[in-house]
Swiss-Prot record:
Belongs to the NrdR family. This is Transcriptional repressor NrdR. NCBIfam families: transcriptional regulator NrdR. It comes from Synechococcus elongatus (strain ATCC 33912 / PCC 7942 / FACHB-805). HAMAP family: NrdR (MF_00440).
Length: 168
């Protein structure tokens, strides 16, 4: 690892620890030439995922785009930034474990709906309204009615109720 101060390539590791939920390793290093201490991060390099949009166009999977959509849906719901990050981590991890590098945008949308419903019913409705392209009040009412009926049937077990809604 090259020293940022003197560009010497030999350094020793002083300390290593896992960070970002185990997705990277943080290393504290010391240059053997000038003694400068610096921090490096090691991350697994993921194979790129190609998202196939509704219109057939392809684009690279963009973690920040997914997070923006989730943040928008979770606005003022009490869902923490950490919970949203973990949700994106889980979805990205699931996509990376697939044998296929191509994924339909609709698959990602369904994954988000299943997970976001566990965090907030309001966030679920907001995300569903954009993802499923609600055209009017009737679409909202139908989804809310199913959500309410299933919530009563499950005696308040919203995650199960919301999960079963994703197949509707």
């Amino acid at each position: 690892m090259q020293c940022p101060a003197c560009r010497h390539t030999d350094s020793r590791v002083l300390e290593s620890r896992s960070s970002e939920s185990g997705r990277s390793v943080r290393r504290r290093r010391e240059c053997l030439s000038c003694g400068h201490r610096f921090t490096t991060y090691e991350r697994v390099e993921f194979v790129p995922i190609s998202v196939i949009k509704r219109n057939g166009d392809r684009e690279s999977f963009d973690r920040s785009k997914l997070l923006r959509g989730i943040v928008r849906a979770c606005e003022k719901t009490g869902v923490s930034a950490q919970q949203m990050d973990l949700l994106v981590d889980e979805i990205e991890g699931t996509l990376q474990q697939r044998s296929s590098r191509d994924v339909q945008s609709s698959e990602i949308g369904e994954m988000v709906l299943q997970q976001i419903g566990r965090l907030s019913e309001v966030a679920y409705i907001r995300f569903a309204s954009v993802y499923r392209q609600f055209r009017g009040v009737r679409d909202f009412v139908e989804t809310l009615d199913r959500l309410q009926d299933l919530s009563r049937d499950e005696v308040g077990d919203v995650p199960a109720a919301v999960t079963s809604l994703t197949s509707a």
